[in-house]
């Protein structure tokens, strides 16, 4: 018996958006209007690339960024939940699928000593250039019309499950924990014995609810959470079964 836990990162594991939090490093703690207004829907990663250039141009160094990022608060109950998962790793495989980037997620998980809880992190690759600028790239290319062009979480999940099957690993149940609009595509891929756990009051919960109202509900079970303690209670029930 093994369960797969799939986590989003921003507004799920942490209680903020890591990409907008980095703006605290700018000289005025805000971006100039021209840069802020340059975002085009579906092209967030390119926008963040421009933000990182602006930070570099203003002399913001790696250590300052790291200090700022590691002050992001975890979502209520999340520290307890990740501790619980860490104590039961023989039953839980755990992955992150996120539109953030490798540098931010790595900093935050390592600072809190949670990096060993997660088996894999799927997110946009980022690195510091020789001149000290943070650069970010698209995670992959895909053909899904519903998702931003740099990341389709359904594709990531499907490829991960296929790879695990090749290794002889299959899961009793998939538990998908997220909050955003880009979490709907993978949730619609889940089967009836899986469970989606959307965060209360966020886009994913609203979109799942709209599907149910239009009589095309998702196949999986749905359990809304407001604190990660709700998620932990559910996982404890799973282990009792």
Predicted features by range, described:
Residues 76-84, 88-95, 100-241:
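C-terminal cap/substrate-recognition subdomain and adjoining C-terminal extension
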Residues 1-125, 130:
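Alpha-helical substrate-recognition element adjacent to the catalytic core
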């Amino acid at each position: 018996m093994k369960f797969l836990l799939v986590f989003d990162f921003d507004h799920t594991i942490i209680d903020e958006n890591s990409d907008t939090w980095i703006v605290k490093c700018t000289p005025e703690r805000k971006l100039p209007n021209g840069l802020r207004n340059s975002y085009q829907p579906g092209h967030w990663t390119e926008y963040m690339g421009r933000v990182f250039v602006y930070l570099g141009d203003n002399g913001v160094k790696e250590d300052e960024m790291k200090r700022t990022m590691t002050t992001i608060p975890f979502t209520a109950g999340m520290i307890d939940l990740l501790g619980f998962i860490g104590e039961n790793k023989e039953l839980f495989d755990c992955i992150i699928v996120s539109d953030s980037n490798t540098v931010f997620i790595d900093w935050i998980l390592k600072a809190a000593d949670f990096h060993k809880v997660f088996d894999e992190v799927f997110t946009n690759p980022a690195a510091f250039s020789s001149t000290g600028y943070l650069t970010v790239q698209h995670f992959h290319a895909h053909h899904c019309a519903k998702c931003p062009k740099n990341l389709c979480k359904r594709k990531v999940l499907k490829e991960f499950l296929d790879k695990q099957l090749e290794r002889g690993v299959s899961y009793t149940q998939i538990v998908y924990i997220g909050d955003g609009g880009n979490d709907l595509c993978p949730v619609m891929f889940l089967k009836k014995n899986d469970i989606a756990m959307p965060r209360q009051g966020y886009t994913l919960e609203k979109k799942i609810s709209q599907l149910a109202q239009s009589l095309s509900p998702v196949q999986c079970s749905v359990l809304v959470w407001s604190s990660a303690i709700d998620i932990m209670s559910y996982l404890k029930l799973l282990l009792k079964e």
